[in-house]
Amino acid sequence: MKSLLILGDGGYGQLVKEIAEILGYRKISFLDDNLPIAIGKLNDIDVLQDSYDETIVAIGNPLVRSQNLLKLKNPTTLIHPSAVISKSAEVKKGVVIEANCVVSASAKVYEGSFICAGAVVNHNAVVNKCCQIDCNAVVSAFSKVPDGKKVASCEVWKNI
């Protein structure tokens, strides 16, 4: 039985849980500082993470996400089965790729980034650490998204 500990039990945490369930995780728990139904607070990660196969951060704030990502011993990457990831693309640990996304040839998605439903990371593009490429956004070919940047829904990001 694959197990997953998710840091953050807000709306995005619930979305991450649904992807994890589709991918076959059966034991899924949360750490959250604000919700009493979580099994603990974010600071409990050091004690609790050894009881899980893998961990992931599902927190929207990129600074908080980055800080918590550094604490994970076994960060995982969750990719929805409907996403299309090129064989030559590079997707690092702690990334969430939602339904109907495309990560094209030679694209790179770095640690802790969220690629939201329907987004496209075109060929040779780079999404740096802890970014959020929101629903139906496009990162144009050869473009680079800086650390912690949110590309808004339906926005086209290009910097060529």
Name these PLM-found stretches:
Residues 1-81:
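Terminal amphipathic alpha-helical/low-complexity segments used for targeting or macromolecular assembly
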Residues 77-160:
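Structural signal for interior beta-strand "rungs" in well-ordered beta-sheet cores
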